[in-house]
Amino acid sequence: ILRYLALLTATLLPGLYLAVIRFHTQILPTNLLLSFADAREGVPFSSVTELVLLELAFELIREAGVRVPGALGNAIGIVGGLIIGDAAVSANLVSPIVVMIVALTALGSMVIPDEEFAAAFRLLKYGFLILGGYLGIYGVVLGIYLTVSHLSGLLSFGIPYLVPFVEEQSVRQTGNGIFRIPFKARKYRPVYARKEQSIRLRKITDRKGRES
């Protein structure tokens, strides 16, 4: 569940922030709205521009950290992010809330274990950012619809990419796609593997407990 939340944060958070701050401010409490307004006072760029610029700066730092070997690469990523973020806020180029949004987005993408998988969602983030920045919540919903529609049409070795969510399955099978139970406790096979024999084979043990 934590990885799913991290994936949603890394993909949707910038777009949702722009949608709320530009089009749907009425859903925010007054005190929070005033805090956002005070934080943006004096910033010369629009909220979309400052968020895109800071995201690109953090992507450059990430790439620099990957290219530099050893512990120095990690140090460049951490120290570089802190220095650039603090300098940008001190120079009144970006607001502190945008630095927080970018930092949370970066942390969410780091939780995703596969780097190529995470890179795809980092690119998708910019699409949601533009849609949310210029179309509001409706743009974010449109982006989700287009993304899910595309993923639903993909096949991996003849199996739908979003199995077990795109086919009519039991609650048990759908739940297995969200929760990871211990392997020894799994009684049933995945829905795409040998449907005629859904129960997994068990190891046979003799009376002394030895496996055969």
Each predicted region: which residue ranges?
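Hydrophobic alpha-helical transmembrane segments of membrane transport and translocation systems
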Residues: V98, A103-S212
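Membrane-interface elements of multi-pass transporters and channels
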Residues: H24-I27, A39, A64, V68, ...
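Alpha-helical transmembrane segments and their membrane-interface boundaries
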Residues: I1-V66, A71-A75, V166, S170-I178, ...
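Long, contiguous hydrophobic alpha-helical segments, chiefly transmembrane helices and signal peptides
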Residues: I1, G15-L18, I84, N92, ...
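Alpha-helical membrane-protein architecture signal
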Residues: P29, L33, G80-G81, L124
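Conserved glycine-centered short motifs in functionally critical loops
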Residues: V66-P69, A75, G80-V98, V102-E116, ...
